[in-house]
């Protein structure tokens, strides 16, 4: 009889173990661990069913264990010691398992060469109105348990810090230059760079934070940028780019009242030029601030904020950036900057490239233009890791977010995500180096 590993290697996605295992104190915990590990090892859905009430109890008792696991996760478990017959039902994602097997290069290397009987089973159900029992996490990059979240944040920050430590050590740089906008991404980049310099025992004054007010900069973000740099003890500089951009507009024949993409991108490229030149002057590195979600959408100016000398946030999705900043804000050593960080977290996400309102409020809000980042991160996670088709992504998002977003709105932003994801690949092909923080960032596509 084939071992279960052989069944999986031969292509079986669903492994069923019919057992007659008795119950003992502590045995169930071990059994659960064994089942979940086996499903992870074989990249399969694993069903375990053992006999229960009605069996002889001369000297042993059967609890009626029923467990369903999928790739290391316990999906459903039957009630133990029940006196009644019961049916345990769970949804398992066969497509997900098949994708994971294709991506695991070593899996196919051990495919059995001996004859194996295969019986085809159709996966499609005739029950069109089948009510799915499985739930989907709307924020797949963020652990639900507080303890796991703490561990995840600490781990990602350490990955970012050690990546930058190695880059500084390798290049021999002793200075860093960062554009500070008063937004989430540049804030996280500054926090990571400060921790890096602390670890290298370099003075924080060797970090030059530059705020570069433009046509859309608001008082709130400008104030937070200056306050954060001062409280963190880095070298602070302020260079207003408005006049330089106006001269540039005249040089290229752009009307000053033109609010086209050229108007916006010229500001981003002016800022990058300033950062690069100051880094050259000081013998330092320009630290990139763009995050994984922005890069997936191509929401960056090519050769503007898209470019740096090392992008510390390039492997961190936007929904996770907010949690990382919040985690750092809650640390005891962050007491002096906590209020500033919390205000930055509450600030609407915006590139601030178009003029603000008369009241000085942000008018250009990113999530109103390209869609909610929590939706895009949901699409990103499931599309890149599992290759789900659009119809399935739409279905899963409807299940995950419930009534928060109408079906039509989810469809609208899914179309935006897919269109931008593929059309903006040319930007990702020319990215600077940056640390891989989550396990779904290594994707190579032709442009």
Question: How should these model regions be labeled?
Answer:
Residues 1-5, 441-447:
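Conserved small/polar residues in nucleotide/adenosyl-binding loops
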Residues 3-88:
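CN hydrolase (nitrilase-like) catalytic-core segments centered on the catalytic cysteine
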Residues 40-44, 53-56, 77-78, 95-182, ...:
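ATP/NTP-dependent adenylation/nucleotidyl-transfer catalytic domains that generate, transfer
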Residues 89-93:
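C-terminal accessory region of radical SAM enzymes
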């Amino acid at each position: 009889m084939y071992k279960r590993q052989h069944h999986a290697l031969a292509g079986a996605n669903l492994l069923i173990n019919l057992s007659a295992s008795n119950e003992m104190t502590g045995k169930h915990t071990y059994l659960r661990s064994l089942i979940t590990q086996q499903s992870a090892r074989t990249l399969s859905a694993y069903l375990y069913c053992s006999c229960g009430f009605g069996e002889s109890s001369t000297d042993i008792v059967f609890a009626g264990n029923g467990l369903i696991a999928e790739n290391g996760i316990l999906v459903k478990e039957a009630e133990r010691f029940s006196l009644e017959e019961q049916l345990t039902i769970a949804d398992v994602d066969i497509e997900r398992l098949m994708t994971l097997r294709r991506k695991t290069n070593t899996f196919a290397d051990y495919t059995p060469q001996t004859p194996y009987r295969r019986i085809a089973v159709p996966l499609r159900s005739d029950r069109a109105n089948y009510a799915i029992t499985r739930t989907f996490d709307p924020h797949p990059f963020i652990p639900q348990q507080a303890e796991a979240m703490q561990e995840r944040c600490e781990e990602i920050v350490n990955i970012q810090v050690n990546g930058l430590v190695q880059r500084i050590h390798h290049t021999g740089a002793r200075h860093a230059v960062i554009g500070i906008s008063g937004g989430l991404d540049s804030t996280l980049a500054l926090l990571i760079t400060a921790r890096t310099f602390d670890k290298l025992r370099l003075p924080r004054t060797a970090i030059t934070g530059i705020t570069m007010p433009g046509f859309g900069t608001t008082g709130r973000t400008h104030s937070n940028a200056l306050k954060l740099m001062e409280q963190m003890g880095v070298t602070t500089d302020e260079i207003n780019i408005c006049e330089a951009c106006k001269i540039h507009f005249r040089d290229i024949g752009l009307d000053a009242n033109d609010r086209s993409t050229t108007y916006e991108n010229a500001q981003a490229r002016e800022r990058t030029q300033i950062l690069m030149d100051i880094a050259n002057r000081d013998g330092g590195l320009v630290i990139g601030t763009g995050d994984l979600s922005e890069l997936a959408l191509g929401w960056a100016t090519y050769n503007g904020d898209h470019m740096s000398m090392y992008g510390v946030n390039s492997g961190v999705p936007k929904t996770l950036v907010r949690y990382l900043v919040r985690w750092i804000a809650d640390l005891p050593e962050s007491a002096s900057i906590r209020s500033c960080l919390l205000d930055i977290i509450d600030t609407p996400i915006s590139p601030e490239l178009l003029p603000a309102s008369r009241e000085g409020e942000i008018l250009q809000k990113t999530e109103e233009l390209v869609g909610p980042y929590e939706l895009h991160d949901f699409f990103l996670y499931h599309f890149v890791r599992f290759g789900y088709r659009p119809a399935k992504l739409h279905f899963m998002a409807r299940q995950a977010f419930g009534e928060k977003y109408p079906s039509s709105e989810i469809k609208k932003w899914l179309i935006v995500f897919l269109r931008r994801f593929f059309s903006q690949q040319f930007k990702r092909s020319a990215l600077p180096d940056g640390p891989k923080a989550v396990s779904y960032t290594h994707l190579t596509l032709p442009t």
